[in-house]
Design a protein with these regions (language model features):
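Cys-dependent protein tyrosine phosphatase-like superfamily
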Residues: 1-88, 92, 99-152
Length: 152
């Protein structure tokens, strides 16, 4: 759990559906360029779960970086209590999710050291992601003060 009502994982599969159902998810945030797996789409539709697909590439030195507009849009969805509980995932649940969670931690005013330690627990050290988290412009995230979670 990232925060109350916010969960992170790798790509869900049929073995996970029973557990995910118990989370009473309202939405899923998928952070990847790949098309979403049809079996997960069908399951989410049956469960009434809304899928937000943000086409986010991984940070790869020296020239490929995550699209800040996509990350800001994903954060806007995650930080709207009308979408909670929410599952955030990419393929492995490490790098892209780690960057988004790192940005959430900055919005929560975590220390830089603490958020990097959390990132490293899930993904190890990756300089390009650490730099992305540090320099991401938080003002790009459009927070709705009426629907912002109380833990933010």
């Amino acid at each position: 759990m990232v925060a109350p009502g916010v969960y992170r994982s790798g790509h869900p599969n049929e073995r996970n559906f029973g557990f995910l159902k118990r989370l009473n998810l309202k939405s899923i945030i998928y952070l990847a360029n790949d098309d979403y797996r049809e079996n997960v789409v069908q399951w989410a539709n049956r469960e009434g779960i809304r899928i937000f697909h943000h086409r986010v590439t991984m940070n790869k030195e020296p020239f490929t970086e995550m699209d800040e507009d996509e990350v800001a849009s994903a954060l806007t969805h995650i930080l709207d209590e009308r979408h909670l509980p929410v599952l955030i995932h990419c393929n492995k649940g490490k790098y892209r999710v780690g960057c988004v969670v790192g940005c959430i931690r900055r919005l929560q005013r975590w220390s830089h050291i603490s958020l990097l330690e959390e990132y490293a627990r899930f993904a190890g050290e990756k300089m390009s992601d650490e730099e992305f988290i540090e320099r991401f412009d938080l003002s790009r995230v459009k927070l709705d003060p009426v629907h912002c979670p109380s833990w933010l």
